[in-house]
Swiss-Prot record:
Gene: 72
Matching PROSITE patterns: CYCLINS
Taxonomy, superkingdom: Viruses
Protein name: Cyclin homolog
Family: Belongs to the cyclin family. Cyclin D subfamily.
Entries under CDD domains matching the protein: CYCLIN_vCyC_rpt1, CYCLIN_vCyC_rpt2
Protein purpose: May be highly relevant to the process of cellular transformation and rapid T-cell proliferation effected by HVS during latent infections of T-cells in susceptible hosts.
Cell cycle found in the keyword field: yes
Single biological process term from Gene Ontology: symbiont-mediated perturbation of host cell cycle progression
InterPro entries per UniProt: Cyclin, Cyclin-like_dom, Cyclin-like_sf, Cyclin_dom_herpesvir, Cyclin_herpesvir, Cyclin_N, Cyclins_cyclin-box
Cell inner membrane among keywords: no
Pfam families listed in its UniProt record: Cyclin_N, Herp-Cyclin
Keywords of this entry: Cell cycle, Cell division, Cyclin, Host-virus interaction, Modulation of host cell cycle by viral cyclin-like protein, Modulation of host cell cycle by virus
Amino acid sequence: MADSPNRLNRAKIDSTTMKDPRVLNNLKLRELLLPKFTSLWEIQTEVTVDNRTILLTWMHLLCESFELDKSVFPLSVSILDRYLCKKQGTKKTLQKIGAACVLIGSKIRTVKPMTVSKLTYLSCDCFTNLELINQEKDILEALKWDTEAVLATDFLIPLCNALKIPEDLWPQLYEAASTTICKALIQPNIALLSPGLICAGGLLTTIETDNTNCRPWTCYLEDLSSILNFSTNTVRTVKDQVSEAFSLYDLEIL
């Protein structure tokens, strides 16, 4: 599915910037400006949340196969959900909408974005290049060009710094926790949570399940709750939800 690996699409961690406490504070403030949803795709009459799960699984495989930056998929999900809370979609057009979201997300968050022709080819020509371009334009107009968003993956390194996790573990944690977050976002109940909470759940799940050389995940629970201004019960519950959503991903692939 993918061309030759393109590691240039994944930026290195800027530890100097990530250690500045203003970065985390600004993320928490910008998070408050995101639209709040009580459920996804309320206005849709034909496509369902189950269709969303199938579409996002394809979109995630796409981003992973082409080694796009880890933030491309979460941004594509955000764009998709915001768009389909405003405009009607159909089962016939859903893949085209998803492809357009990946196209936009990759233009914003990666060095070498996906191309229209490549996305058309990967859809088995379910739509033409022109149809995809027009779909991209429709999404941009519906969102009034406000496509960027604070993402769960944006919180990862600032939180690692705030939790005093050794800097040499950051790249490994970022890679593993980003994958956990991306797979969990496919489930609609996770997408309804705030990015900071999703990040907390993804980080704790990764520490629990991967060989990260960190302390046990419970050692970070209280500090993480304090940093994000949530109760420990809330963060623990979200961690359990993310763990469950992460485990569902492989079942859906099978």
